[in-house]
Amino acid sequence: MAPLKKGGEKKKGRSAINEVVTREYTINVHKRIHGISFKKRAPRAIKEIRKFAMKEMGTPDVRIDTRLNKAVWAKGVRNVPYRMRVRLSRKRNEDEDSPNKLYTLVTYVPVTTYKGLQTVNVDEN
């Protein structure tokens, strides 16, 4: 059994989940829809992108841009691209009566190659 720490005081810092931030990610869609039947591949890819954004940004309200939807569906329902570069933007919700203060907007970033790309913070411009 692990020994108990004495004086277990935690620093009370600000949660990073409440900050407005934008990051670019590469999502491996192929591994997320592996084994899914043909007629459900593109819809499942959209659900998996939504799930990924929810996990990374910590907001239950995720909005997917129409250009990203078109990019997923570009080759049909069964031939979804293997990887996608997306920009996740955590933003403040302007709607006062919404239960969530923040939402995540997922937009498509077209790239020629995925080699050497890493997750990067994008400054708000």
Curated annotation (Swiss-Prot):
One GO term under biological process is: cytoplasmic translation
Say what the protein does.
Component of the large ribosomal subunit. The ribosome is a large ribonucleoprotein complex responsible for the synthesis of proteins in the cell.
- What's one Pfam family here? Ribosomal_L31e
- Judging by the UniProt lineage, the source's domain of life is Eukaryota
Q: Name one GO molecular function term.
A: structural constituent of ribosome
Native organism is Ictalurus punctatus
Which UniProt keywords are listed? Cytoplasm, Ribonucleoprotein, Ribosomal protein
Protein name from the UniProt record: Large ribosomal subunit protein eL31
Q: How does it assemble?
A: Component of the large ribosomal subunit.
Question: Mind telling me which InterPro entries this protein's record contains?
Answer: Ribosomal_eL31, Ribosomal_eL31_CS, Ribosomal_eL31_dom_sf
Task: Show the GO cellular component annotation of the record.
Answer: cytosolic large ribosomal subunit
Family, according to the entry, reads as follows: Belongs to the eukaryotic ribosomal protein eL31 family.
Where in or outside the cell it occurs: the entry states: Cytoplasm
User: Quick one: where is this thing mainly located?
Assistant: cytoplasm
